[in-house]
């Protein structure tokens, strides 16, 4: 991937709701009627999502930034 592609990905992440995202799964974490993803601003409910989908989406907010930072760190070592 080139720097422009990585910056485009980082920009999408930065435009998303900030803060940690957490998946709350009915029957696993909560007993309130429906699963949701808690963000810093609002709760997100996704119709038709599986438990794996909720976990993936919630973790992507943090994981993608971590991966981009690691790519940047590794590239700076090569320079």
Task: List PLM regions with ranges.
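Extreme N-terminal leader/activation tails
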Residues: 1-69, 73-79
